[in-house]
Amino acid sequence: MGNIVYFSSVSENTHRFVEKLELPATRIPILGRIQDPDFVREPYVLVLPTYGGGHANGPDPDAGGYVPKQVIAFLNNEHNRSLIRGVIAAGNTNFGAEFGYAGDVVSRKCGVPYLYRFELMGTTDDVLAVRAGLENFWKEQTCHPPSQLQSL
């Protein structure tokens, strides 16, 4: 099975969710730049929170602000971007159509599937669904390697 790369803010909601998955995971740091060129060495699924929300007319892809800056910097590295295979996003259902919208943005810009969205730190059902879904996803990836991904 592939790896998980994730970002969690100081709220730690995404971190708690990833811990409950009990799968190999690498955290994008909150502060500072990633210095290690081998920070990621294998294909991964990105798990991230959604920032912003509350736009009166729903999601505004041109407004930006949904994807944490640390994740943008991470994905702007061509090597890191070349290894992403899917995205899972956290969000808050109070934001309606913007719930988990960071996943929509990353999926569109990186040309990878949006696999799942969960609220805040997820439920037990979310953990079970993601674990099973990732197992199936990585089996499928092994059978059918992805084509070259687009640049951001």
Swiss-Prot record:
It holds the Pfam family Flavodoxin_NdrI. It comes from the Bacteria. One of its GO terms (molecular function) is FMN binding. GO terms for biological process: protein modification process. Probably involved in ribonucleotide reductase function. Belongs to the NrdI family. This is Protein NrdI. It comes from Mycobacterium sp. (strain KMS). The lineage of its organism: Bacteria, Bacillati, Actinomycetota, Actinomycetes, Mycobacteriales.
